[in-house]
Amino acid sequence: MRRILAGLLVFVFAMPAARATDVISVKLMTLELAVDIAQGAIDACRKDGYQISVVVVDRSGRTQVVMRDIFANQYMTQLARAKANAVVLSNTSSSALRKNRADIVNELNLLDDLLVMDGGLPVTVAGSMIGAVGVSGAPGGDLDEACAQRGIDRVQERLDFAE
């Protein structure tokens, strides 16, 4: 009887631990943070003389913010979104994806709303991606990526101290 009781006690106390993994917590980017990242990228590119589009997506690739400078055309917005989606797919910058997976870049670029070109960066908190930013419109993907980085830099302290 004692063995049965001991076994039941172990089972009962082990159940909450097993159930604890049924629910997870995730960090999500606020609209305010996404707006500040996008505005930072726009401001950075304007300072350098470029008219760009910026798209900020959440960790699942859902669009949170779209900003298009006055002379940036609609295709730049599509390209920026597709670059951000490449980041969500790979959990790394779109330039790193292009370099690291050169063997399948052509196939990846056939996917709808995904483009493996420089200009997309992850937004991370404590090593976890909470979103991505894509930029298009500067004269070169490296410059798009630099503007995206400056957008993230604008909020980096907030990211560093996020709970």
Where are these regions (language model features)?
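Flexible, solvent-exposed loop/hinge segments and secondary-structure transition points
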Residues: 20-163
